[in-house]
């Protein structure tokens, strides 16, 4: 099976119209709120179109005609329509917000679910700061697009059309003269949107970089302080901040050019009416009420037209955010369930690497023709220099990655032909970098089995030599461990991670330097617990300690991407003893790195 590199976070961009349509499609489940909002919008616009006609009647029939009744009734109707318009505006805004917040809720859930499903290869290339910005800031801009921004855009369009028709029906020549500015306004708005959107996206990507820099700085705060690099980090952050500042200035420059131009064009309508309309009134070709109605229509038109530039810029910004959100949602994970993949049933634990080669992101190989077979219940120790491929071997077993060539068989079945979740449910893992979540010790231990009972959790902690130190905390198993477990020592975090693996009760166990950061006494406790845990389970251990190598049923020595030597336990000798006899590389590692451990123990 060939390997394809995953799509990076920044990839080809969808077309603008497609992005807009796709954003709006998220409103479909909430169509009652959307329909209600837009019906109220139409009602609101109808009221806006009626008000100038009522004012015309008050001026021509009431004031000019001397009919006080028309004035009184006209004022009452205007007051009623104003109150009704306020109610419509309130309800429309409320329903729009419900729908748009629901869209944001769905998008955040979709992004989070997608990130859970994407392969390690995607997360290896993506930057955390970028993903956080897209899941929060960009989703909020899409929310604004599907809510008030698009509603206001529709309102402007409906008002322009409605006012244009009303003005044309009143006086054709004056209306045509006034409305000549509309095509120019539309052109400027479209030009402005097309120019502003890529600039807005560039600014957002600079915000990604700034967020990533800040996130990395906060995550490595202890290292920064330990190496006295505060000023250097301040300088790096300032460089990113300057780039963001420059990108925002360029975008705002375009915005500053477009908005005044639109306001200038919109104000020209009032000038035309006063010049030409005044002459028509003097020539008795237009009533004073009609002129007042015209100026009222134009004033109604000017406000939304002036907002058109801001609306277009907001829509352009939101569409750029939509592109970035959909880049995540459209990303394809390299490791997926193949068509026809079936859940993995109970397994014995026989595992075979069959001429497996692997390369990260399709680049140079890190594993080359790895071939070995492990029987159920055996313990396999992997030994080799940094970069020899130990971590890559164990990463292929739970399908964190798929081989570039060859295949991995579990009980004779290609692991790519079973569902990923069912495969991983049979595997317990203790990674080198222990990850604990910002919650209680109990919930961290039960992470792999959320429904585990109290006795099971305590038993797992006891087997991992964690129970005693947990009880030393005032809140015991309810102790909050803080972000990434910062309130615990390295050894304590490792033992909780081991308890988590024990509670899962896997058939296959993977240990990545699981006891590398504990003292001798704690190591002895953990080694005894792991020996009990590994009984009857197929286990893979990246070995750094001689005791692990002596207990292993098989020892694989990796060098330059290949298996340089393999030792197996027999009735006559251990895998360790065999390798000392047949492998010069293993003997060199033993005398340089492993034998000193033995000497320390016997001192």
Q: PLM ranges: what are they?
A:
Residues 29, 33-46, 151-202, 273-286, ...:
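Transmembrane helices of ABC transporter permease
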Residues 1-51, 63-77, 92-100, 113, ...:
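Membrane-integrated ABC transporters
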Residues 32, 117-121, 137-146, 150, ...:
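An intracellular "coupling" helix at the cytosolic face of ABC transporter transmembrane type-1 domains
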Residues 337-338, 344-603:
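ABC-type nucleotide-binding domain
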Residues 21-24, 32-53, 57, 74, ...:
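Alpha-helical segments in transporter systems
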Residues 8-16, 39-40, 47-56, 60, ...:
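Juxtamembrane helix-loop junctions of ABC transporter transmembrane domains
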Residues 66-67, 166-180, 189, 250-323, ...:
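Helix-loop-helix
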């Amino acid at each position: 099976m060939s390997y394809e590199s995953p799509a990076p976070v920044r990839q080809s961009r969808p077309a603008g119209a497609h992005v807009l349509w796709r954003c709006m499609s998220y409103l479909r489940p909430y169509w009652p709120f959307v329909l209600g909002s837009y019906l109220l919008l139409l009602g609101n616009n109808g009221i806006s179109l009626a008000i100038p006609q009522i004012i015309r009647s008050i001026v021509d029939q009431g004031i000019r005609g001397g009919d006080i009744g028309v004035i009184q009734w006209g004022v009452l109707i205007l007051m009623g329509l104003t109150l009704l318009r306020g109610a419509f505006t309130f309800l429309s805004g409320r329903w729009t917000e419900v729908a748009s917040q629901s869209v944001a809720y769905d998008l955040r859930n979709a992004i989070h679910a997608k990130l859970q499903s994407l392969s390690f290869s995607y997360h290896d290339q993506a930057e955390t700061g970028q993903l956080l910005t897209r899941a929060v800031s960009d989703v909020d801009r899409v929310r604004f697009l599907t809510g008030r921004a698009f509603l206001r855009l529709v309102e402007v369009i409906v008002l322009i059309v409605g006012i244009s028709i009303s003005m044309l029906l009143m006086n054709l020549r004056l209306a045509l003269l006034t409305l000549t500015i509309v095509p120019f306004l539309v052109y400027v708005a479209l030009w402005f949107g097309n120019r502003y959107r890529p600039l807005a996206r560039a600014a957002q990507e600079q915000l990604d970089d700034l967020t990533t820099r800040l996130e990395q700085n906060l995550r490595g705060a202890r290292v920064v302080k330990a190496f006295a690099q505060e000023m250097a980090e301040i300088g790096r952050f300032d460089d990113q901040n300057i780039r963001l500042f420059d990108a925002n200035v360029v975008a705002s420059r375009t915005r500053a050019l477009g908005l005044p131009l639109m306001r200038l064009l919109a104000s020209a309508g009032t000038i035309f009416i006063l010049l030409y309309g005044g002459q028509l009134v003097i020539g008795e070709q237009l009533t004073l009420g009609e002129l007042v109605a015209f100026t009222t229509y134009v004033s109604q038109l000017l406000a939304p037209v002036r907002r058109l530039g801001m609306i277009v810029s907001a829509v352009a910004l939101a569409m750029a955010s939509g592109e970035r959100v959909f880049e995540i949602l459209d990303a394809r994970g390299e490791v997926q369930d193949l068509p026809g993949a079936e859940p993995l049933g109970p397994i014995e634990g026989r595992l075979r690497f069959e001429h497996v080669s692997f390369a990260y992101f399709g680049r140079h190989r890190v594993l080359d023709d790895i071939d070995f077979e492990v029987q159920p219940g055996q313990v396999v120790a992997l030994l080799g220099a940094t970069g020899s491929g130990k971590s890559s071997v164990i990463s292929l077993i739970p399908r964190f990655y798929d081989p570039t060539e060859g295949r991995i068989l579990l009980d004779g079945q290609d692991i790519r032909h079973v569902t990923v979740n069912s495969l991983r449910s049979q595997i317990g893992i203790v990674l080198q970098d222990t990850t604990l979540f910002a919650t209680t010790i109990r919930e961290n231990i039960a992470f792999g089995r959320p429904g585990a009972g109290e006795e099971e959790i305590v038993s797992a902690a006891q087997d991992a030599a964690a129970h005693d130190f947990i009880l030393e905390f005032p809140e015991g198993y309810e102790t909050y461990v803080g972000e990434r477990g910062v309130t615990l020592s390295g050894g304590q975090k490792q033992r909780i991670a081991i308890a988590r693996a024990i509670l899962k009760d896997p058939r296959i166990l993977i240990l990545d330097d699981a006891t590398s950061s504990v003292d001798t006494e704690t190591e002895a406790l953990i080694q005894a617990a792991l020996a009990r845990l590994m009984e009857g389970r197929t286990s893979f251990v990246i070995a750094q300690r001689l005791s692990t190598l002596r207990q292993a049923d098989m020892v694989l020595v990796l060098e330059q991407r290949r298996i340089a030597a393999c030792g197996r336990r027999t009735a006559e000798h251990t895998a360790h003893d065999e390798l000392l006899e047949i492998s010069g590389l293993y003997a060199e590692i033993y005398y340089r790195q492993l034998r000193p451990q033995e000497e320390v123990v016997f001192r």
